[in-house]
Amino acid sequence: LENIDSLFMAMTYNIPVQSVIFSGLRGVGKTVLINSLQKKAEEKNIFCKHIEVEERNDFISQIASCSQAFLRKISAKEKFKHLIQKPLEAIKSLVISFDPNDSTFSLSVQERELYKSSNLTQSLTDVFTTLGEAAYQSEIPICFFIDEIQYMKSAELGALIAALHRTNQLGYPIMIVGAGLPKIYAMLSEKKSYSERLFL
């Protein structure tokens, strides 16, 4: 826990850090742990959002909603409003392409075609890197707390790892604190060879 506290502290200095995944059987206190870590992060003025992945497969909807919440936070300050457009465009593309039932963005058929993407990894990477740039410039780091990661679709997990990897390469302060059943480690190692470097 001290290690994680030092990661949070590094983020407040705009230093990119590794993400953290906790695994264990049901009932061992993973959710309680990540909730307490979220409080610690919030005390350091890190922007935090909790996502509980469920079998109904709504990860894309939740990550988009959490990302928009970050943009609302920074838009409250006039000097940061110019940072919003790029991540908003990326979120729009992600939602229109991979969460078609979402009605957040009302666009014409022609506009929808402009935002349409068939590559989830690229779309989520665009969201994370543009969010990361806004986080860096506004000096408001971001931490997403994701519970029940094992319910993520394989393509979503692979896209999340790739997005985190690219964000980390660019030096942006975004991290994940996740929790899941023990099989999550096998799922991570199957997805990307560099996932072991991304997570503590």
Regions found by a protein language model. Give the residues of each.
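Phosphate/oxyanion-binding active-site loops and adjacent basic polyanion-contact surfaces
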Residues: 1, 120-124, 153-156
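Alpha-helical scaffold elements adjacent to nucleotide-binding pockets in ATP/GTP-utilizing enzyme cores
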Residues: 3, 36-40, 62-66, 159, ...
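P-loop NTPase nucleotide-binding core
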Residues: 13-28, 32-142, 172-174
